[in-house]
Amino acid sequence: SWGDITPIRRTVTGTITFDTTNGSTSVTVNDTGHGAIAGDFVTFSGTTGDPGGIPNASLNNQFEIIEVFNANEYRITSPVAATSTATAAGTADAAYQINTGSDKSFIDFGWGTGTWGLSTWGTPRPPSASLQLLSQVWQFDNYGEKLILQYVDGGIYEWDPASGLAVRATAIAGAPTKSKYALVSTPDRHLVCFGTEDTIGTPNTQDPMFVRFSNQEDINTFVPTATNTAGGQRLTDGNEIITALRSRGQILIWTDTSLHGQQYLGPPYTFGFQQLGANCGCIGPHAAADVNGVAYWMSKDAFFVFDGTVKKIPCTVQDYVFKDINIVQAQKVHVGINTQFNEVTWWYCSFTSDYIDRFVTYNYLENVWHIGSMARTAWADIGTFEKPIATEYDPESTAATLTTIYGLTAGRSMLYNQEDGVNGAGSPIFAYIYSGYFDIGDGDDMLLMSRFIPDFKNQVGNLTVRLLLRAFPQASASPSSLDPYVITPTTEKVDTRARGRQIQLRIESDELDSNWRFGTMRVDLQKDGLR
C-alpha cells in the first residue's frame, strides 16, 4: 500500500477563507503568514459555506499552490468552477507540507551579488559558490524500526511504521535544525549530523565542517553532558562536508576535498576521527557507495576506491563523463549498486541538461566500464526486494498520480522494478554489442569474410548482424553490400562476401520481447590480395 508521510510544517484551524470569481476555477486562499512558496502542497479539511458555490467536498482535498501573491494570499486551482463571486467566503482547516524546494540547482545572480563596485553596470557577475542554490535532496536511514529522514541543509525527521501510513513524519525534538547529512552509527546507535549547527536549533550557526552526534540510544539529546555520550568534532581539509557512509568498522566522511574516518571508541571520547585521504572529495551527497566494506565514489573529475587506502580508479571513459557533466547539478549525482552483476553505477546530468540523463557503470570484479543514457534518481539493490527498485523523475510529465492532487503542474516520479523481464517499461530495449576492427597481417592484406555461423543462446525474436568495412584506419567505414543480415532463431549460416582491410562486427536487436546471449560465432576468413 501507499501513503504520504511528508512532514507537515504548519496547521491552521478554522481561519482559512477563499476568494472566488464566477465561472473560474482559480481560487485565492487567505491565510495570514502562510509561509508557502509556489509549488508547495496544502490539504484543506472541514470546509464550510460552499465558498463561491464550490462544494465543500471539492475543496476538502490536496492542492498544489500555483502562485503566491504575498505573505497572506496564494492561488490554487479548484476541481470545479465557482458559481458566484465571493470574498473571504467559507472557512477551512489547512495542513501545509514542508516547502518543496527546487528540483534543480542554480547560481543566484540577483541583487547584492559580489562586492560593491564590482565590474560595470549591466555586466553579468562571476558565479559565487556561496550563492549557489541547491536542489532539495533527501536521505534516509533506519533507527531500529523507525525511518530517519533528512534533506541537505534541512532538519531531521522520524517516522514510526507502527503509526501507519496515515501518520506523517515529524521533526526530531532536540535535534539540529540544519545539517548537510545525517545517519545512524551502528552498532552503537548514535544519530550523527554532518555539517551541522554549533548552537542546536539556531540555523544561522551552521558550520559546514562540524560533526555532531547524539547521546547513545537517544536521538533527542545532542547537548553533551558529563553523564551522556553526545558530542561533536570539527573536521579540517575542505570547505564543507558533502556526505557520509557506514563502512567496515567506521563511518566514512567526505568533504569537497578529502576523506575522513569516524570510529566508535566508547567513553570518554565516544568517537575518534582521522583523515584518510586528500584531493579525493565527493561530488554529491549520494555519490558514494559501500560494497562489502569497500567504498566507491565519484569526485568532480575522477572515480576513487577506499579499501584501506584511497586509490584513483583507472577509467577508460573518464573524459567522456567529466567533459560533459553539469557540475551545477552535482547535487543530483546518484550511485546504485547492482550486486547481481558486480556493478556500481553513477547517474548524472550531462552538460546541457538540468536533470539526470546519463549513467556510467563500473564492474569492480572485471575492472571494465560502460556508459549509456538513462534517468534514475534513486536505487535500492536486491535484499529487501527480489529485484532492484529504482525511480525516475520526469520534469515534463503530466501523467496521473497515485494520489489526487488538484492543480498539479508538470513533474512526476515513476517507480521501476529493475532487471525484471527483457523490455523497458513495455517498450523494446535497443541492445547491441560491437567488436573492435580486426584485420589480417597487421592490415597489409585485404580480408575476405565469405560467411559466418551464428551462435546465440536463448534467442527470442530476430536480431541484426552488420559488417562495417574500411580500407585504412582513418578511412570512413561502409557497410558490406549485403548488409544488414537478419538472424532468426533458426538461421544456420549467413553468406556475406564482405571485403576490406579491417572489419567490425555489430550485433543489434530492437524488438519487443527480444532476448539473446552471444556465444562463440565462427567466421570464414581468408586473405584476398594486397589491394
Features from the language model and the residues they span:
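Hydrophobic or amphipathic alpha-helical targeting/insertion segments
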Residues: 145-159
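Beta-sheet repeat architectures centered on beta-propellers
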Residues: 1-2, 102-107, 111, 116-120, ...
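Secondary-structure transition/turn motif
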Residues: 30-35, 76-85, 152, 162, ...
